[in-house]
């Protein structure tokens, strides 16, 4: 925890110095950005499947299932000249309910995450519509509930590195070093060091149609303890196309991919989802 304390103190001093420098700037803005409040849902309902188990028509003998996931992604964005400070809350939770015709229904989680983060960036240089400079970040990563007898994830994560940001398309593109303090398992608290690259991109194809992507790749370099479920590599990526339906309501297809490998496993685990999402996306200028 000593490393974490030193890092956070440095981040606060960094942010305070920048804020003091920009205090006299006239172009300060504070925005509440609702990046996405969304619902992803699909339902398959099959009636009288028992009578059609010998049918060559798969649709008549399939298992009924429900898939639903909710996403809440907001940020309080402060900009003052070269200084940018974002405080964000990301939450998602989803379940899949499977109902075979001759068995009891089963429910499994397909998503569960709560991420509270604060990010400070400073533009030392500006070129071609890009801002470039140092960035620091602190985050707390946890879950709504436990599943299948496993403990609830609890991780404090800090990043420091360089970033391109505040561009019309490249909202954030960063390369950082990472320090994690993982206290998911009681009695097995672990400190980890990693390298991470991440992005948040938005492209306006035409009025009312926007393509967006966000994600990260994290490579772990060292650990204070051996915990077989700790990840060695972790990739998460989302690609979404939003089309305005009415006002700030959008609908569109999305692709989500997660691939990772744990220390105690020889093969990669992955999760690939394609679907349609309904979203509410807007922003409110506070200053």
Feature roles, as predicted:
Residues 42-69, 99-106:
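Surface-exposed strand-loop-strand hairpins of Gram-negative outer-membrane beta-barrel proteins
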Residues 230-287:
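Predominantly the C-terminal beta-signal and adjacent terminal strand-loop region
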């Amino acid at each position: 925890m000593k490393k974490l304390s030193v890092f956070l103190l440095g981040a606060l001093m960094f942010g305070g110095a920048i804020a003091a420098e920009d205090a006299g700037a006239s172009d300060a803005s504070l925005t509440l950005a609702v990046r996405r409040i969304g619902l992803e849902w699909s339902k398959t309902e099959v009636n009288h499947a028992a009578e059609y188990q010998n049918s060559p028509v798969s649709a008549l003998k399939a298992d009924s299932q429900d898939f639903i996931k909710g996403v809440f992604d907001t940020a309080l964005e402060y900009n003052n000249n070269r200084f940018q400070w974002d405080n964000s809350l990301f939450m998602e939770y989803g379940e899949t309910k499977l109902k075979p015709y001759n068995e009891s229904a089963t429910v499994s989680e397909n998503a569960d995450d709560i991420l509270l983060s604060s990010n400070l960036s400073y533009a030392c240089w500006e070129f071609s519509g890009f801002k470039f400079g140092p960035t620091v970040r602190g985050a707390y990563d946890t879950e709504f509930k436990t599943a299948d007898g496993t403990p609830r994830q609890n991780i404090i994560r800090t990043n420091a590195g360089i970033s391109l940001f505040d561009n019309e398309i490249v909202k954030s593109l960063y390369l950082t070093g990472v320090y994690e303090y993982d206290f998911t398992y009681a009695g097995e608290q672990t400190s980890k060091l990693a390298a991470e690259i991440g992005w948040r991109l938005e492209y306006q194809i035409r009025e009312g149609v926007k393509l967006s992507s966000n994600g990260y790749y994290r490579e772990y370099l060292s650990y204070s303890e051996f915990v077989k479920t700790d990840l060695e590599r972790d990739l998460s990526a989302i690609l979404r196309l939003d089309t305005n339906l009415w006002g700030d309501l959008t609908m569109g297809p999305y692709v989500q991919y997660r691939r990772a490998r744990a220390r105690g496993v020889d093969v990669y685990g992955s999760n690939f989802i394609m679907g349609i999402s309904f979203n509410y996306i807007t922003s409110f200028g506070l200053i």
